[in-house]
A protein has these predicted regions:
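Short solvent-exposed coil/turn linkers within tandem alpha-helical repeat scaffolds
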Residues: 1-11, 15-27, 35-46, 55-66, ...
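N-proximal helix/coil linker or "cap" segments that precede and/or mark the start of modular domains
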Residues: 78, 86-132, 140-143
Length: 155
């Protein structure tokens, strides 16, 4: 029974790879990492990441490779494991380095900014703008006071 499960997983892997080549990775990332119930469980994160890396390499598809890096980073980010944030940032930085013009690189940049600047206990970045009456407004002018920031617009 154990060998049959291994063979079944290998067959599933081959089917997933065939599907990935046909669809450029759409839906494959979750399936390999075991997040999609319909696949009957995954391979575990380490093996799934290795398979994703190999898939990105052999496919030659830049979009798929960018998706793999972003998926790995997101998986680390949400895992809650010790040191996972460092691993996530490494993947986001790699994505930005290899695919600087990809839309996921922009998202990665935002994730890194949030991790480095928007955490509990950190000083709030200054916000400069106009109030409803057109007067200059700086968040730093209200340091030490309770402030409510309400963003609104007509879009």
């Amino acid at each position: 029974p154990k060998e049959r499960r291994k063979v079944a997983k290998l067959r599933l892997y081959l089917d997933l790879i065939d599907n990935a080549h046909a669809t450029h990775g759409k839906g494959i990332l979750r399936a390999l990492s075991g997040e999609a119930d319909e696949w009957g469980g995954g391979f575990g994160r380490d093996l799934a990441f290795a398979l994703l890396d190999e898939l990105a390499l052999v496919s030659g598809n830049a979009d798929l490779a960018a998706q793999v890096l972003y998926t790995k980073a997101s998986n680390y980010e949400w895992s809650g494991e010790e040191h996972a944030e460092v691993l996530a940032i490494e993947q986001y930085e790699l994505l930005m380095e290899r695919f600087p013009d990809h839309e996921l690189a922009l998202r990665a940049e935002g994730k890194i900014f949030a991790a480095e600047n928007l955490q509990i206990g950190m000083e709030v970045p200054d916000i400069v703008g106009k109030d409803v009456d057109g007067n200059d407004l700086k968040l730093s002018d209200h340091r030490g006071k309770v402030a409510v920031i309400n963003f609104w617009g007509f879009w």
